């Protein structure tokens, strides 16, 4: 579908044009009223002129609206023609016939995860599935913490990060330090109390100096710059302080690297916390249902085009366990490595999984069976001189 068709609708949209004409007519009528009040003898002449102008504006509005609706109707027909497809051509109901309970569970978890607790309770009841009590507690906690971050109240996030400090340190995460840093800067920008900021830093951030000393120093210097400015200007107004500092930095003369420290990105902090929270509990950052729907939306146009081509060529899709065309998904949707057997050059599947031999090299199960003559004899590894026994091979999970 050509984007020009949509641009044509935007160009013929009557909103601004009609408003401009009505404003012009209003101005003319007001001028005519003033003229009549000033010189009543011209009233009839002014009324005739106003009537003619009103009719002219009315006719212009009708033409503008008609032109717009013509473009809109044409675009609607183009949409119908473009998206006239039958999803039944690419359905695969057999894949879901025995998975209704799993699908219902995924839906309920999505509702809980989105915070739609009442809807989730009702769905579980009507679907006849048990409510995931542990997940409910986790998602309720996450919702409370995220709301705290949005309200710039970091008490709950810091408590959670402190409780999970061991996990975060093993993972190499700087979440707890980042939360403390945001709280330090946020408190200062609100209170403008530099001594309170120094005390907070000594009490709550000393334990992070081994790893984050340079950043702590940079943060405190940024606060000292702000404090210096307040002393020199004699003001202590906390209202929208960071935006005031940024907009007036030419006069304040604070180096840009310290301005950047003060400009807190709360949305990024929220995303960082949710990522670490979900990782700590073995959950994905995004709802699995979101991922499935988004991946399906990306694949749908390609599969529909493939189905159309196969219909024209009178062929059928006979592949099992794989698609006849490649679907390119974003890198964030790549969760598992794809293993290709060095012997058969085939990709591993659930039915033909990768197997690691005692020498450490990996081939797929079918290649292992063929090399060992159905497990009846020892065989030499295709890539090293070691001999192996099929029974010693173990499945590999990527």
Curated annotation (Swiss-Prot):
Localization per record: Cytoplasm; Nucleus
Pfam families in alphabetical order: CTLH, zf-RING_UBOX
Gene3D superfamilies: Zinc/RING finger domain, C3HC4 (zinc finger)
Main localization, broad class: cytoplasm
LisH domain: residues covered: 99-131
GO cellular component: cytoplasm; cytosol; GID complex; nucleus
Subunit comment: Identified in the GID/CTLH complex. In the absence of stress, the complex exists as an inactive anticipatory complex (GID(Ant)), composed of Gid1, the E3 ubiquitin-ligase Gid2, Gid5, Gid8, and the RING-like subunit Gid9, awaiting a substrate receptor to form the active E3 ligase complex. When cells are shifted to glucose-containing medium, the substrate receptor Gid4 is induced and becomes part of the complex, named GID(SR4). Additionally, Gid7 transforms the GID(SR4) E3 ligase core into a higher-order supramolecular assembly (Chelator-GID(SR4)).
The protein, known as: E3 ubiquitin-protein ligase gid2
Organism: Schizosaccharomyces pombe (strain 972 / ATCC 24843) (Fission yeast)
């Amino acid at each position: 579908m050509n984007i020009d068709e949509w641009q044509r609708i935007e160009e013929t949209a009557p909103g601004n044009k009609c408003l401009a004409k009505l404003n012009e007519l209003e101005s003319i009528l007001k001028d005519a009223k003033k003229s009549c009040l000033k010189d009543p003898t011209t009233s009839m002449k002014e009324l005739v002129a106003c009537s003619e102008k009103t009719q002219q504006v009315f006719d212009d509005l009708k033409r503008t609206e008609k032109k717009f609706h013509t473009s809109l109707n044409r675009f609607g027909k183009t949409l119908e023609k473009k998206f006239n497809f039958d999803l039944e051509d690419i359905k695969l109901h057999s894949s879901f016939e025995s998975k209704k309970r799993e699908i219902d569970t995924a839906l309920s978890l999505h509702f809980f995860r989105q915070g739609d607790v009442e809807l989730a309770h009702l769905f579980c009841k009507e679907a006849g599935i048990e409510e995931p009590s542990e997940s409910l507690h986790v998602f309720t906690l996450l919702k409370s913490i995220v709301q705290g971050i949005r309200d710039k109240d970091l008490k709950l996030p810091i408590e959670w990060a402190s409780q999970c400090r061991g996990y975060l340190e093993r993972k190499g995460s700087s979440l707890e330090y980042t939360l403390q840093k945001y709280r330090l800067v946020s408190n200062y920008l609100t209170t403008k109390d530099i001594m309170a900021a120094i005390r907070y830093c000594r009490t709550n951030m000393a334990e992070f100096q081994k790893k984050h000393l340079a950043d702590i120093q940079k943060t405190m210097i940024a606060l000292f710059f702000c404090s210096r400015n307040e002393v020199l200007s004699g003001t202590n107004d906390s209202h929208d302080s960071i935006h005031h500092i940024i907009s007036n930095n030419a006069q304040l003369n604070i180096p840009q690297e310290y301005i950047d420290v003060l400009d807190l990105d709360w949305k990024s902090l929220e995303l960082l916390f949710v990522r670490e929270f979900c990782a700590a509990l073995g959950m994905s950052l995004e709802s699995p249902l979101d991922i499935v729907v988004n991946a399906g939306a990306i694949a749908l146009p390609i599969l529909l085009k493939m189905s159309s081509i196969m219909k024209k060529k009178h062929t059928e899709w006979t592949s099992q366990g794989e698609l006849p065309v490649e679907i390119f998904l974003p890198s964030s949707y790549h969760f598992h490595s794809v293993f290709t057997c060095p012997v058969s050059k085939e990709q591993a599947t659930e039915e033909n999984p990768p197997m690691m031999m005692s020498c450490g090299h990996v081939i797929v199960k079918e290649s292992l069976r063929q090399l060992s003559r159905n497990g009846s004899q020892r065989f030499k590894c295709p890539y090293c001189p070691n001999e192996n026994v099929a029974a010693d091979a173990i499945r590999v999970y990527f």
